A protein has these predicted regions:
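Fe(II)/2-oxoglutarate oxygenase catalytic core
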Residues: 1-145, 149-184, 190-218
């Protein structure tokens, strides 16, 4: 169990949140190493592995109710949605850090973000997620994507990179981001196509979105 009284367990502070917000305002995306302390990442990894071993994940779908369906040509990962009221101490510390980040982004970008929704995601060897946007067609509620990686000792040979297409006018221009444990990736959900390349070992993350009430265009 993680205690927030231990300074080594605490997430990065206000300066880090402000840097992320400024990067979103400047280029629309940001990569933050060591967003959470290693001990806290270890707790989250252990939780995800226990839930997986107990059969608590399900195949991820494409679309949103009532159009949600399984499409292995698009994605083959497994997910378990977070329930904040029933979350562990480690999850609550992470969600508290995201709340601080939400406020910092609202101060800088005036986006009116009001809540976070997210899930644990596990990619088994060979799993992938093809190129896509995080906003559903005609529904602009998901506004800022946040991905926290929960992987030990990841190297390029393990695959599973996040490929973020950083220029809509240049499809060949992209960043490939290794899913390093403790690293947080944030980007504007409506702006950037992205994909997860096939993983060669189990790959774990918490993926989620800050949402708006009315789906403003940004």
């Amino acid at each position: 169990m993680v205690s927030g009284n231990n300074v080594t367990d605490r997430p990065q502070g206000p300066d880090s949140y402000a840097r992320i917000a400024l990067s979103l305002a400047d280029q629309g995306w940001c990569v933050t190493p060591d967003f959470l302390a290693p001990r806290l990442i270890g707790e989250l990894i252990g939780e995800a592995e226990r839930i997986w071993n107990a059969g608590g994940f399900r195949h991820a779908g494409v679309g949103r109710d009532p159009d949600l369906h399984i499409n292995p040509e698009v994605r083959t990962d497994h997910v378990r949605w977070l329930v904040p009221q029933a979350g562990s101490d480690a999850q609550r510390l992470y969600l508290h850090a995201l709340e601080e980040l939400r406020q910092a982004i609202n101060r800088e970008l005036y986006l009116g973000l009001f809540e976070f929704e997210g899930h644990l995601a596990i990619y088994t060897p060979g799993s992938y997620y093809r190129k896509h946007l995080d906003q559903f067609r005609g529904i602009g509620l998901r506004t800022v994507t946040c991905i926290l990686y929960l992987n030990r000792d990841w190297v390029a040979e393990d695959g599973g990179q996040l490929r973020l297409y950083t220029d809509p006018d240049e499809p060949s221009r992209y960043e490939e981001i290794l899913p390093l444990g403790g690293q947080l990736v944030t980007f504007l959900s409506a702006r950037f196509l992205h994909e997860v390349l096939p993983a060669r070992r189990q790959r774990i993350s918490i993926t989620g979105w800050f949402r708006q009430h009315g789906g403003l265009n940004i």
